[in-house]
Amino acid sequence: MQIGQLQHKGIRTESAAASFYLDTSITGYSDIGKPVSITDDFTVGFGADGAEIIGYLESYEDRITETVKMGGVNWHMCAEFTYTGTDPTAGSHVVADGAGNVKLAGAGAGLNTLVCAVDTTNKVVSIIFR
């Protein structure tokens, strides 16, 4: 596989991670661990406000020679993210807030996430992806 021809053929769901191009919302190593959404073909970023989260950024690589930024995204796991806005509750769902955090999902959204615990003091939510 060459850079510029990224494919996900053959990746089994048990792998729980895959490589993606990174959009301009992701700027460096400090974004590792933040929730990401699909923003274009084979591309992830922080997504628009309310976008479905597919996982978290597991790695960051600036391939200067190829002029692309790439990262690994993990999606089969438990994670803790900072949230904004209304406090989620256990059993609710979250979506992207467009700035590298999550927020309480509206009706019918964020169904691939399940809130397990909420720390309202530190604005941190524990979720599992399903």
What is the role of each PLM region?
Residues 1-130:
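Surface-exposed, low-hydrophobicity beta-strand/loop segments enriched in small/polar/acidic residues
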